[in-house]
UniProtKB/Swiss-Prot annotation:
Gene (name only): kdpB
Chain ranges passing through the membrane: 37-57, 69-89, 223-243, 257-277, 586-606, 614-634, 652-672
Superkingdom per UniProt: Bacteria
InterPro entries: ATPase_P-typ_cyto_dom_N (IPR023299), ATPase_P-typ_P_site (IPR018303), ATPase_P-typ_TM_dom_sf (IPR023298), ATPase_P-typ_transduc_dom_A_sf (IPR008250), HAD-like_sf (IPR036412), HAD_sf (IPR023214), P-type_ATPase_bsu_IA (IPR006391), P_typ_ATPase (IPR001757)
EC number: 7.2.2.6
Subunit annotation: The system is composed of three essential subunits: KdpA, KdpB and KdpC.
Residues forming the catalytic site: D307 (4-aspartylphosphate intermediate)
GO molecular function: ATP binding; ATP hydrolysis activity; magnesium ion binding; P-type potassium transmembrane transporter activity
Localization per Swiss-Prot or TrEMBL: Cell inner membrane
Protein name per its UniProtKB record: Potassium-transporting ATPase ATP-binding subunit
Reaction equations catalysed: K(+)(out) + ATP + H2O = K(+)(in) + ADP + phosphate + H(+)
Organism whose genome encodes this protein: Rhizobium meliloti (strain 1021) (Ensifer meliloti)
Keywords, comma-separated and alphabetical: ATP-binding, Cell inner membrane, Cell membrane, Ion transport, Magnesium, Membrane, Metal-binding, Nucleotide-binding, Phosphoprotein, Plasmid, Potassium, Potassium transport, Translocase, Transmembrane, Transmembrane helix, Transport
């Protein structure tokens, strides 16, 4: 399955219509009180509405003006709740699909642990420790561990990956997930999770946001926004007193409009949507985070611990070079190795064919092959008899034995080539034509293409990369140098991983790592961001705070980028929101006092038509900017792999300066429309 997320259509009626309905439900003050900025906005909208109703009843006041202010204040609140509802709605479809996979499941519970007699019960009645029997064509009724048997399992309902996986008792492939289907054979499963707390249940709750808790950064930002709101509330009350002293009459409608336009309603209205959208982006990468805290931690990560096999390298030994002995050309060696590998279906054999035909441009036909010699554990070599030639390749000692060469007859250059390959972490394969030694094929665990560039990007972001491997230090150093990692941990045991993580954390660093085995569980639990593979054990998945449904270790890099994008988006829109207040200040303050203090007219740098037009234009802009920024909040600020200082400069220029300039233009255009339409 692709790691790239699909970008949802933000104008999809299936998302917008339910979100519009949910936006009205979220107007409940008991829900809005969790967002102080929007709660104050709703309170002001209700207050202005009350005075508008009184004006209509008594026939006094500026009813058209106060009615429009009331309407746009309500729109401000609605647009904020709509942004959150749209963000939540994008995960509803996947949650509904997951809920469908677990509905009406039944289980065949074993009557006796050692027997095969079963009784059928609803899956919801299963308890932790129960043993169930699942055969081909049946759905696994709950999360558990395979204790007996081996089976092919279709996990597409959970991972989206159509290729079946093997689940068997013991080892790191024993964990199974409720709602997945057994395709062949049978397994005996011990239930490890109570109904309602299964992996699918947790996914549904996380996707829908039902259990979403505010992250530490969100709490800190909410406190900042609440503080700003309180400061502006005190300022507006003080302004009312000053206006009374100067005989300037300021209505409740005007003061309410002033307060709402000055408090940071833009980021206040989009804050929840940004957090939900960050987790949703992970879901679209097929990664489930247990909390928003984990996503934020990914954005602050300083060090990545990456397993060598599968993450940095392919994990299969592949041919990388031909090293002929004196008197043999590289073409002759390549031809012999190619012929000896034509019938070899192992990854190593196919890689020799690919190297000879690709990089060396050799070609060979299977015609003329008299016999094929397959690889066996006893002989440790393979090859062909071709037109009277006996071509063999394999382990060095096996090929030397086949060739019948004594130590004195082995070329020194051959020994040096074998030693060179071994020292650099590779595997030497000898090639012989009868009793004639031709040379060595260098097999090595090939570094994935493009991985070095990815590590360079991470380094530019200030993130250290550490390769973890069980290889000896010489081999580890060679691969680390080729891959471009900053450090490596050789001959690593689970205890070594845990000790390394603790050492880094004691130095004030945040650590991210991935793993799939039970032996990885302590390190996954200790890491600030622990990503477990869906194909891993139950212990690993429970210890981690993220689960990768594609089981792709390389995805840890994308997870870090998504975390950074979340933090950047929140910071950028906060900067934009606060910068907006400057333009609104120049729009409203002169309008309030220009009749009493004509000298304040010089502050009307936008040349707004009238005091009422200026106030109404600022309120309208304040509401519309929330709608305009919803796509950015959901999609996220564009991420570039550069250093923190460069990112800060760029975002301050775009969102700080943009937050200053855009409201001037926007309020002026709205003022022209308001005055031309005679709305005040």
């Amino acid at each position: 399955m692709s790691n790239k997320p699909t970008t949802p259509n933000l104008v999809d009626p299936k998302i917008l219509f339910p979100a519009a309905k949910a936006a009205f439900v979220k107007l409940d003050p008991r829900q809005l009180v969790r967002n102080p900025v929007i709660f104050v906005t709703e309170a002001m909208a209700a207050l202005v509405t009350l005075f508008f109703v009184l004006d209509v009843a008594t026939g006094g006041g500026s009813r058209l003006f106060s009615g429009q202010i009331a309407a746009w204040l309500w729109f401000t609140v609605l647009f904020a709740t709509f942004a959150e509802a749209v963000a939540e709605g994008r995960g509803k479809a996947q949650a509904d699909f997951l809920r469908h996979t677990k509905s009406e499941l039944s289980a065949r519970k074993l009557v006796a642990p050692e027997g095969r007699e079963t009784k059928e019960i609803p899956a919801t009645m299963l308890k932790v420790g129960d043993l169930v029997l699942v055969q081909a064509g049946e759905l696994i009724p709950g999360d558990g561990e395979v204790v007996e048997g081996v089976a092919s399992v279709n996990e597409s309902a959970i991972t989206g990956e159509s290729a079946p996986v093997i689940r068997e008792a013991g080892g790191d492939r024993s964990a199974v997930t409720g709602g997945t289907e057994v395709l062949s054979d049978w397994v005996k499963v011990r239930i490890t999770t109570a109904p309602g707390s299964t992996f699918v249940d947790r996914m549904i709750a996380l996707i829908e946001g039902a259990q979403r808790q505010k992250t530490p950064n969100e709490i800190a930002l909410s406190i900042l926004l609440s503080g700003l709101t309180l400061i502006f509330l005190i300022a507006v009350v003080t302004l009312w007193g000053l206006a009374s002293y100067s005989a300037t009459v300021l209505s409740v409608t005007v003061l309410s409009a002033l307060l709402v336009t000055l408090i940071p309603t833009t980021i206040g209205g989009l804050l929840s949507a940004i957090g939900i959208a960050g987790m949703d982006r992970l879901v679209r990468f097929n990664v489930i985070a247990t909390s928003g805290r984990a996503v934020e931690a990914a954005g602050d990560v300083d060090t990545l611990l990456l397993d060598k096999t599968g993450t940095i390298t392919f994990g299969n030994r592949m041919a990388s070079d031909f090293l002929p002995v004196p008197g043999v050309t590289v073409e002759e060696l390549a031809d012999a190795a190619l012929l000896a590998s034509l019938a070899d279906e192992t990854p190593e054999g196919r890689s020799i064919v690919a190297l000879a035909t690709g990089e060396f441009g050799r070609g060979a036909s299977q015609t003329g092959i008299d016999a094929v010699v397959p690889f066996t554990a006893e002989t440790r070599l393979s090859g062909v008899d071709h037109r009277g030639r006996r071509l063999r390749k394999g382990a060095v000692d096996s090929v030397l034995r086949f060739a019948g060469l004594s130590d004195s007859k082995i070329p020194q250059e051959f020994r040096q080539a074998v030693d060179k390959v071994a020292r650099t972490g590779g595997t030497p394969l000898a090639v012989a034509d009868g009793n004639r030694l031709l040379g060595v094929v260098h097999l090595k665990d090939v570094v994935k293409p493009g991985i070095k560039e990815r590590f360079s990007e991470l380094r530019a972001m200030g993130i250290r990369t550490v390769m973890v491997t069980g290889d000896n230090p010489i081999t580890a150093a060679a691969i680390a140098s080729e891959a471009g990692v900053d450090d490596f941990l050789a001959e690593a045991t689970p205890e070594d991983k845990l000790a390394y993580i603790r050492k880094e954390q004691n130095g004030g660093r945040l650590i991210a790592m991935c793993g799939d085995g039970t032996n990885d569980a302590p390190a996954l639990a200790q890491a600030d961001v622990g990503v477990a593979m869906q194909t891993g054990t139950q212990a690993a998945r429970e210890a981690a705070n993220m689960v990768d449904l594609d089981s792709s270790p390389t995805k840890l890099i994308e997870i870090v980028e998504i975390g950074k994008q979340l933090l950047m988006t929140r910071g950028s829109l906060t900067t934009f929101s606060i910068a907006n207040d400057v333009a609104k200040y120049f729009a409203i303050i002169p309008a309030l006092f220009v009749t009493t203090y004509p000298a304040l007219g010089v502050l009307n740098i936008m040349g707004l038509a009238s005091p009422q037009s200026a106030i109404l234009s600022a309120v309208i802009f304040n509401a519309l900017i929330i709608v305009a920024l919803i796509p950015l909040a959901l999609k996220g600020v564009r991420y570039r792999p550069v250093g923190a200082a460069a990112l800060l400069r760029g975002n301050l220029l775009v969102y700080g300066l943009g937050g200053l300039v855009l409201p001037f233009a926007g309020i002026k255009l709205i003022d022209l429309a308001v005055s031309n339409l005679n709305l005040v």
